[in-house]
Amino acid sequence: MNIPENLQYTAEHLWVRPDENGHWLAGITDHAQDLLGDIVYVEAPKPGTRLSAGQPCGLVESVKTGSDLHAPLDGTVTAINEALQITPEEINDRPYDAWIFSFEPEHAPTGLLSAAEYRALLG
């Protein structure tokens, strides 16, 4: 299983990383996309949406099931990856490049997992 060292993770199987503009990108992990199977639809939170850490903020649907996206941190959504509206399967092909939304954290990020901690969580 692919768990890049340069990312941070949530127990709800999201990865996050800062971008060059000081915002953070969020997407689902390789483990999550593997469990979901072939992804057919992504409902990202709209720009301007207020995020509350751990609360549902979007949805990923596959041919097998659907799964809520849970906000990784408190903050405000700044953009969504519009390409995923047309080609949601990009998440299956490249889960760590296919970010779902970007956001501006309300405060310094805390409570995120390192790659080693996420790997341990998965067992």
From Swiss-Prot:
Family stated for the protein in its record: Belongs to the GcvH family.
Lineage of the organism: Bacteria, Pseudomonadati, Pseudomonadota, Betaproteobacteria, Nitrosomonadales
Residue ranges constituting the Lipoyl-binding domain according to the UniProt record: 23-104
Protein name: Glycine cleavage system H protein
Organism encoding this protein: Methylobacillus flagellatus (strain ATCC 51484 / DSM 6875 / VKM B-1610 / KT)
Gene3D superfamilies: 2.40.50.100
GO cellular component: cytosol; glycine cleavage complex
Record-linked InterPro entries: Biotin_lipoyl, GCV_H, GCV_H/Fam206, GCV_H_sub, Single_hybrid_motif
PROSITE patterns according to UniProt: BIOTINYL_LIPOYL
GO BP terms: glycine decarboxylation via glycine cleavage system
Keywords: Lipoyl
Cofactor(s) required for function per UniProt: (R)-lipoate
